[in-house]
Curated annotation (Swiss-Prot):
GO terms for biological process: chromosome condensation; intracellular iron ion homeostasis. It comes from Yersinia pestis. It is an enzyme of class 1 (oxidoreductase). This is DNA protection during starvation protein. It holds the Pfam family Ferritin. It catalyses: 2 Fe(2+) + H2O2 + 2 H(+) = 2 Fe(3+) + 2 H2O.
Length: 167
C-alpha cells in the first residue's frame, strides 16, 4: 500500500517539462520571449525587404551588411523560440501572429535609395534594441536574460553600423 498523498494542483497552461524554473517565472518569460520572437521575425523580414530593394551609393556594402544582420537576427529568434519551448511554452512565429502583435510600423515599399532605407531601418532597429534592453531586466530567468543580452549587443552594433552609413 502506497503512503503517497494525492496533492491537488492547479492545471497548468504549460507543457510538461522537468525544467524546475518556477511556473510563474516560466509564464512571464515565455511571454517576453515570444514578444522578442515577433519583433525579430518582423525586423529580419524588414531587413531583407531593404536588402532587395535599395539602390544608390554604397549599395554593395550596405546590401552585404544587411545580409549579415539578417543571419544574426534569425539565429537569435531561433534561440528565443527554442527557449520558450524548453520552458513548456509554444513559440509564436506565424505570419498572422507577427502581423497582429508587432510593435514595428509597417515598412514602406515605395522607397528605393540606400539612404531612405537606412533611415527606415534605423528607426525600427532602435525600437527593438531599446525593448530588448528592457526585457533583460524584466525576466527572472537568467538563461533568457543572457540570451537577450547577447542579442542586445548585436542590435546595438547593427544600429551603430546603420546610423554610421546615414549621410
Amino acid at each position: 500500500m502506497s503512503t503517497a498523498k494525492l496533492v491537488k494542483t492547479k492545471p497548468s497552461e504549460l507543457l510538461y517539462t522537468r525544467n524546475d524554473v518556477e511556473e510563474h517565472v516560466k509564464v512571464a518569460t515565455i511571454k517576453r520571449l515570444n514578444q522578442m520572437v515577433i519583433q525579430f521575425i518582423d525586423l529580419s523580414l524588414i531587413t531583407k525587404q531593404a536588402h532587395w530593394n535599395m539602390r544608390g551609393a554604397n549599395f554593395v556594402a550596405v546590401h552585404e551588411m544587411l545580409d549579415g544582420f539578417r543571419t544574426a537576427l534569425t539565429d537569435h529568434l531561433d534561440t528565443f523560440a527554442e527557449r520558450a519551448v524548453q520552458l513548456g511554452g509554444v513559440a509564436l512565429g506565424t505570419a498572422q501572429v507577427i502581423n497582429d502583435k508587432t510593435p514595428l510600423k509597417s515598412y514602406p515599399t515605395n522607397i528605393h535609395s540606400v539612404q531612405e532605407h537606412l533611415k527606415a531601418l534605423a528607426e525600427r532597429y532602435a525600437i527593438v534594441a531599446n525593448d530588448i534592453r528592457k526585457a533583460i531586466t524584466e525576466v527572472e530567468d537568467e538563461n533568457s536574460a543572457d540570451m537577450f543580452t547577447a542579442a542586445s549587443r548585436d542590435l546595438d552594433k547593427f544600429l551603430w553600423f546603420i546610423e554610421s552609413n546615414i549621410e
